[in-house]
């Protein structure tokens, strides 16, 4: 992992970066590094604690966005209906971008714009970005989406016993969370 992964600290002046770990033996930054930086800027404007930006390529999340409409509220609702943990972990929902050319400034700008509203942004047919105050928080967000997408895909959206909206609403109330407006019926 030290060749293909890296941990970078951005200087307090915002113009310098320091490699703390990784990219050994000729490893280099991903082509999506500019997207990471733009996402950092957007999330830090929303929450100063969100200093972690993580990008992964989770199989079931990618599979789910190939069979579901690219509608953020519908996609979020399907996740919330599949796992009671989902609304608790990401009550703000999941942002979605259409299929775009990765590694470009265009997708970076679009991702950064979504990051102003969402902590999670799915890149259709590619992967997901998650943010948080810690590595555990960012990974936990992504892992919860992936686990829930796996449940959805294993049932191919034909589950009979989905979680009703009143239960999702009750979970949100119990945990003092505000679900993304317009998702619950």
Regions found by a protein language model. Name each.
Residues 1-185:
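Glycine-rich flexible loops
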């Amino acid at each position: 992992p030290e060749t293909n992964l890296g941990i970078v600290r951005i200087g307090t002046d915002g113009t310098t970066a320091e490699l703390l770990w990784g990219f050994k033996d000729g490893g280099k930054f991903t082509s999506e590094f500019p997207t990471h930086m733009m996402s950092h800027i957007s999330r830090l404007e929303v929450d100063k604690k969100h200093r972690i930006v993580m990008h992964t390529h989770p199989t079931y999340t990618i599979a789910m966005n190939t069979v579901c409409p690219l509608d953020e509220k519908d996609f979020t609702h399907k996740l919330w209906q599949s796992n009671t943990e989902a609304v608790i972990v990401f009550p703000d929902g999941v942002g979605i971008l259409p299929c775009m050319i990765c590694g470009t400034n265009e997708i970076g700008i679009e991702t950064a714009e979504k990051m102003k509203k969402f902590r999670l942004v799915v890149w259709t047919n590619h992967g997901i970005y998650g943010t948080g105050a810690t590595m555990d928080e960012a990974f936990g967000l992504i892992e919860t989406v992936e686990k829930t997408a796996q449940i959805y895909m294993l049932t191919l959206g034909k589950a009979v016993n989905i979680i009703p909206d009143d239960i999702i609403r009750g979970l949100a109330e119990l945990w003092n969370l505000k679900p993304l407006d317009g998702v619950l019926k």
